[in-house]
Curated annotation (Swiss-Prot):
It holds the Pfam family Ribosomal_S5_C. This is Small ribosomal subunit protein uS5. Belongs to the universal ribosomal protein uS5 family. N-terminally acetylated by acetyltransferase NatA. Keywords: Acetylation, Cytoplasm, Isopeptide bond, Methylation, Nucleus, Ribonucleoprotein, Ribosomal protein, Ribosome biogenesis, rRNA processing, Ubl conjugation. Component of the small ribosomal subunit (SSU). Mature yeast ribosomes consist of a small (40S) and a large (60S) subunit. The 40S small subunit contains 1 molecule of ribosomal RNA (18S rRNA) and 33 different proteins (encoded by 57 genes). The large 60S subunit contains 3 rRNA molecules (25S, 5.8S and 5S rRNA) and 46 different proteins (encoded by 81 genes). Interacts with snoRNA U3. Interacts with MPP10. Component of the ribosomal small subunit (SSU) processome composed of at least 40 protein subunits and snoRNA U3. It is found in: Cytoplasm; Nucleus, Nucleolus. GO terms for cellular component: cytoplasm; cytosol; cytosolic small ribosomal subunit; nucleolus; nucleoplasm; small-subunit processome. The modification N-acetylserine is found at residue 2. The gene is RPS2.
Amino acid sequence: MSAPEAQQQKRGGFGGRNRGRPNRRGPRNTEEKGWVPVTKLGRLVKAGKITTIEEIFLHSLPVKEFQIIDTLLPGLQDEVMNIKPVQKQTRAGQRTRFKAVVVVGDSNGHVGLGIKTAKEVAGAIRAGIIIAKLSVIPIRRGYWGTNLGQPHSLATKTTGKCGSVTVRLIPAPRGSGIVASPAVKKLLQLAGVEDVYTQSNGKTRTLENTLKAAFVAIGNTYGFLTPNLWAEQPLPVSPLDIYSDEASAQKKRF
């Protein structure tokens, strides 16, 4: 073997660049990274300073990370209510995307609604679930008649409106069930309501507006105080003020 050939063999042989050399790069890190909170509220939740979502609702703290909801409500369920294509006319022609309507809830007084449009169905569903988690609200449940057992219905009549659709929720006796359309019934089931009558008016075929109207209606249950809540109570200090040092701690960067 001549000297040039031996030198080429030592370099890795003839052919493409770096061919024959051992791969020095390690395997790709396919493991999912843990949640690194970027907000003060997220740091307190991950540190265990805030253990219930009611503390967040009591002080009207904005939730910017969906992992907060996953931590405080581990039993949250999601349901895809509708997926439909939407089009936009452009110079190059019609651009088609997909809109997903998603509802999340724990069947124990918490429910959220998310709507997202994306190029792919899977991306629209994933983003819709995140938006629904960020929009989770509490539901005030009550009784029809005597206060026996666990709350099974709504405390009062409520009404919600979106577009031309108006949805009215009326408390019902125990055992009546949810008398509503399939979409609204699923929303109320995820909210934890067992017995309720519903009345809807307008273009109810527009499923998106119907769900929005029902979502506004059940959200209005906390829009006012019933007589049993008229007594003045001292407002506790916000967790952001109690744990201000832990909330302001930034992650060290090297």
